[in-house]
A protein has these predicted regions:
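Bacterial Sec-dependent N-terminal signal peptides
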Residues: 1-26, 38
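Interaction-mediating elements
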Residues: 22-143
Length: 143
């Protein structure tokens, strides 16, 4: 009886782990907007792997490149985060107003990482500066 209880307890505790599992996929399995984004801004960068993660019933995608760049997409193919610690993120991949703010206020710095959530954007520059923008791309503050 004790063994059965322990087994059921272990099984019950492992279910959340099963709900969030990663699986390798091919580029053709990405949502169309994600494929277009990669084609437009990272076409010259070789992909090392693509993963789909099911998290709370929603698909999320992570694309890793051989130059150590990484892009995370939501279930609709909209980017959630872009990062590259070996080379700057292509300027054209960034929202125009964020790109202009960085160019005007941080001459010589490039964007190394950008994250989008339901409140706005967090941007990390190559000079170590961290910036926050709202959803309308207005600068809010330095982090």
């Amino acid at each position: 009886m004790k063994k059965t209880f322990v087994l059921l307890l272990a099984l019950g505790m492992s279910l959340p782990l099963l709900a969030s599992c990663e699986r390798r996929i091919k580029i053709e399995q990405l949502p169309q907007p994600a494929r277009e984004f990669i084609s437009n801004y990272f076409n010259d960068t070789e992909i090392s792997r693509i993963e789909r993660e099911k998290d709370h019933g929603r698909n999320e995608y992570t694309v890793r490149f051989k130059d150590r760049a990484k892009i995370e997409f939501d279930e609709n193919g909209r980017w959630k985060s872009i990062e590259n610690h070996s080379t700057p993120i292509p300027a054209d991949a960034l929202p125009q107003r964020i790109r202009e703010y960085v160019n005007n206020h941080h001459t010589g710095a490039n964007v190394r990482e950008i994250e989008r959530d339901d409140r706005g954007f967090e941007v990390k520059l190559t000079n170590g500066t961290e910036l926050q923008f709202d959803l309308a791309y207005n600068f809010i503050k330095y982090d």
